Amino acid sequence: MAAAGSSQAPISFGFNRSSKKKLLVSDGEKEEEHEKEYLVGAEGKELLSANPAPESKPLVIPLIHKNRWAKPNKDKEEDAAPQTEDEAVLSQAVKELIEESRRAQEDNSETNQTLSIPLLMQNRMPDGYEDREKVDVSLRPDSAEAADYDVVPVQQYGMAMLRGMGWKEGEGIGRTFKQDVKPLEQKLRPKGLGLGADRSALKHLEPQKPRKPLKPGEEPEEESKGLGTGSAVQIQSGAYKDMYGKVEGIDPDNSRAMITLAIGGKVVTVSLFSLRLVNSAEYTKYAKDLSRLSKVHQESKVEPHRDRTPEKEQGRKGGEKRSESSRNADVKLSKSSGNGDSNNREKRHRQRSPEQEKEKKKIRPEPHGWLRRDIRVRFIDKNYKGGKYYNSKMLVEDVLSPTRCVCRTENGCILEDIRQDMLETIIPKEEGEHVMVVLGKYRGMVGKILHRDKQKSRALVQLQGEHDSAETLSYDAICHYTGAQDD
């Protein structure tokens, strides 16, 4: 029985598990966050502590000159039985020989640079691990943990690697000609600005006005900077003429800007070419002055000659009275001289009267405007923007006044404050196209072209609406219409 019991002894299996040490934030660091800190004083916006924090040194990641491959049998060697005295002496001798040969190789590599092995070849994987069909990654280092990334911030990683390679801030790199070269920063060029062009160079070409000496208590005028977000401007044309505002945004592709008006706070979109930069003093003084926008102020500003005409007439009348009194005192002179004076007086009077009539007729009524929305016109002004839009077709988007409008080109560009004399009407080439009557009795009516007479520059138009009749109209009285039609 005893023999049978001994043969049935229990069998047990054991496994050894090696765990990697993880980088964790110690409890001491967490406790330091909650420690009390005593303040000594305050300088500006900075608080002075009784225990100032040590200055942070620049982070350095040392360069790996030679890879230290992990040994896969490291755990087995540790668990192996201790070596005898003879084996320990033998292993120590082998290590010393290997170290001595390594130093000799390093000395030879320093003396003879032609025999140096490239760094990538020195640090390559040993043979038999990753050069077969089955890749053995046992020599590879362990993957990084989250705590490893906390030690090195992402923003300082690149600079830390450069410092480990020997780079120092402010010192140039290179072997013979060391020079600190600043990195080239690319700047976005505005649309239409040619290569090599610089907008700042225009300021040096402009004639500079001589500066007057400042009076006691007078402040120097503030020089207006370039047009940008927050700049104070004045609108010189369009529906918001003579109003002040500040730039909220700029669209360089369409040459337009978003302006917040000083009066009312409304955000409007205007052309960049209708803006004038102003300084802060002018903006503060006139931005919210409503008296500038009154009709009385505008009339006195546009027509100042009206105030001076009565004075001129009084001066002329006074001169005539003085000449008459002097002539009465010299009645005793010869009749021939008296007759000559009277004739000269009548001639001078005849010469003055047409001038006075011209001054009275200076204010002429504006010509009849033929501008309408949704009509196609042709641009005929060669001087506008250097003739960029000359002889191009465009569409009238909006009519600001009887003789001014806003146009949109075929490319989608918006042109503001375009005068009527810069445009001409367009007649469709094909019959059956819609036109609008812009002048004459049927002004504003839409119709279809039935027949065109090129020799006499007129067309037979079938009008729509109440008349519904065919009329012969001149080319100057009709224009191509692209808006909605009543079928």
UniProtKB/Swiss-Prot annotation:
Residue numbers spanned by region Disordered: 65-121, 181-232, 295-367
Source organism of this protein record: Xenopus laevis (African clawed frog)
A molecular-function term among this protein's GO annotations: RNA binding
Location in or out of the cell: Nucleus
Residues annotated as domain KOW: 226-253, 428-455
Coiled-coil ranges from the UniProt annotation: 88-116
Name of this chain's protein: G-patch domain and KOW motifs-containing protein
UniProtKB keywords: Coiled coil, mRNA processing, mRNA splicing, Nucleus, Repeat, RNA-binding
A GO biological-process term: mRNA splicing, via spliceosome
GO cellular component: nucleus; spliceosomal complex
Biased amino acid composition, Basic and acidic residues: 96-106, 200-209, 295-333, 352-367
Task performed by this protein: RNA-binding protein involved in pre-mRNA splicing.
Pfam families: G-patch_2, GPKOW_C
Keyword Metal-binding tagged: no
Entry-linked InterPro entries: G_patch_dom, GPKOW_KOW1, GPKOW_KOW2, KOW, Rib_uL2_dom2, Spp2-like, Spp2/MOS2_G-patch, Translation_prot_SH3-like_sf
Family in the record: Belongs to the MOS2 family.
Record-annotated G-patch domain positions: 154-200
Family matches, as SMART domains: G_patch, KOW
Description of how the protein assembles with itself and partners: Component of the minor spliceosome, which splices U12-type introns.
